[in-house]
Amino acid sequence: MIARSKPNVDYNFLWECICGKGQQIDNTISNSFFFNSGASSLLFFLNLFGTKKRVGLQVFTCSTVLDVIQMAEDRVVLMDIDKDYFTTTYDIVEKHIDSIDILILSHLFGIPNPDYLRIKQLCQLRGVVLIDDLCQTFHAKIGGYFLEDLSDNYFYSFFYDKPISATSGGMLKLSDDLYT
């Protein structure tokens, strides 16, 4: 693992914040938490579901995401991509949907997944938790709506090579049902 992206999560502090026992932070995005890296935010998210989960991941993604899945002691189910959008498709996800518990859907180079709404609906119907990897995409639109507004769970990285650059850091946004 790249040393700069090794997750460092204060689980007790975060759990106290989630349960409302910690300090209150005024966020404009509800249910959002900030971390030292995008990898830390993803690790925290995966750990909410325990270990040994089957995590769907497209083959063209940052190697740090794969490292985090392994750190969480989960199993990776790799999925192919569409070469025009650099992301997986509805048809590919549908083939794997019964063999995954969580789907990490990466949106790369500012291009949202063109099948996003269908994939999200499929995940909801099959009980698969969907989290959007928005580390390379900020305020991309689908049907006139920002991807962030359509997504229930997503994470950012604020490393120097990302759309929102702050040298380091990350953010996780949780859905209401995971937050409460």
What are these regions (language model features)?
Residues 134-166:
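Conserved active-site segment immediately N-terminal to the catalytic lysine
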Residues 163-180:
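Conserved core segment of the aminotransferase class I/II
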